Amino acid sequence: MAKLTVSDLELSGKKVLMRVDFNVPIKAGVIGNDNRIVAALPTIKYVLENNGRAILFSHLGRIKSEDDKKELSLAPVAARLGELLGKNVKFVPHTRGEELESAINALQDGEVLMVENTRFEDVVDGVEVKNESKNNPELGKYWAGLGDDLFINDAFGTAHRAHASNVGIASNVSQVAAGFLMEKEIKFLGDAVANPVRPFVAIIGGAKVSDKIEIVKSLLAKADKVIVGGGMAYTFDAAKGEKIGNSLFEADKVELAKELMAEAGDKLVLPVDSIAADAFSNDAKTEVVDATAGIPDGYMGLDIGPKSVKLLQDTLADAKTVVWNGPMGVFEMPNFAKGTLAIGEELVKVTENGGTTIVGGGDSTAAVQQLGVADKLSHISTGGGASLEYLEGKELPGIASISEK
């Protein structure tokens, strides 16, 4: 069944509740990266242009004490949103109460209001109660009552969580629609899982097998090839009996890696060489080491080597759908970023050849942005954990709560 979207709604004159994902990096009131704010603009603008009255909810960081609230107000985010929209965003420094209700009731058509950080509700009078993050039913009902029975969920990044500001509001209104960003995420990730154009190649990187094991299992059942890189690859190398020196690995996951390799056969593509370093430092002494020769003691693998890059390029050469989540090495150090950046470059070629390319996860997204190729790929997912769980085939509460057409 197709989900209800923002373009299916009658918005004029309505108080429209919207969950957005404005969980941006912020330090001393300065926003480090406003990508998530920019990503929500199409939906917000659509509501305003159609004479709706937009009431925005978002979380920011984690609130565990009253002190956290001083650092994590959404006031700077509201100011930045106003600059991007070119109009005043009314900010209310509360999550409930008379001031908030009056401000919402005073809104005119085409105006926008931002509610304070929804996670301020997780700490009340200094006590951690988690009203927002544990989906307190009274809170969801209260927030739902601030609007006109309409709710737009455009926060894919929190779709894997059942919070008061997404699932709680949704369960108390009659029409719940996906915003344009949510709609795009569902389309690209949903098609990749359910109906990929083949060959379908998945690339999974990152430090730990334990973080990504479910996604690797799930993708081995769906994809034609699954490339595994990053720190997690050394657990597979250890499972093959190869020397990994001082490389990161999880001893308790070696048996699991053996089972996966036995089941997957040649579907699973592992690095064949590494850039090994004598210290966890960009200035470390390095050498290229074949996996079969092994990494010597005192050295650790910090990136995939040139033969592995060539193997990845060959594996991706005829791909028609590619999903990438996680770096191939210690991407934040320039000397160990080559493998990760090479994937970004290869994905541009796949896209130019008519393929669909989907990137998720902070490091992978940072890599394509560093290369300046984000706009040359099909889709950059805004959800880290949410995109992984969706690709695993799990039902996400935030998506499940959106109305069917």
Curated annotation (Swiss-Prot):
Assembly: Monomer.
Pfam families noted in UniProt:
PGK
Q: What does UniProt give as GO cellular component?
A: cytosol
Q: Which PROSITE patterns match?
A: PGLYCERATE_KINASE (PS00111)
Protein name, please?
A: Phosphoglycerate kinase
* PANTHER family named in the record: PHOSPHOGLYCERATE KINASE, PHOSPHOGLYCERATE KINASE 1, CHLOROPLASTIC-RELATED
State the InterPro entries in the record.
Phosphoglycerate_kinase, Phosphoglycerate_kinase_CS, Phosphoglycerate_kinase_N, Phosphoglycerate_kinase_sf
State the organism of origin.
Answer: Leuconostoc citreum (strain KM20)
Q: Which family does it belong to?
A: Belongs to the phosphoglycerate kinase family.
Q: Where, per UniProt, does this protein localize?
A: Cytoplasm
> What pathway does this protein act in?
Carbohydrate degradation; glycolysis; pyruvate from D-glyceraldehyde 3-phosphate: step 2/5
Catalysed conversion reaction: (2R)-3-phosphoglycerate + ATP = (2R)-3-phospho-glyceroyl phosphate + ADP
Q: Which UniProt keywords apply?
A: ATP-binding, Cytoplasm, Glycolysis, Kinase, Nucleotide-binding, Transferase
Q: Which GO terms describe its biological process?
A: gluconeogenesis; glycolytic process
Q: Which domain of life is it from?
A: Bacteria
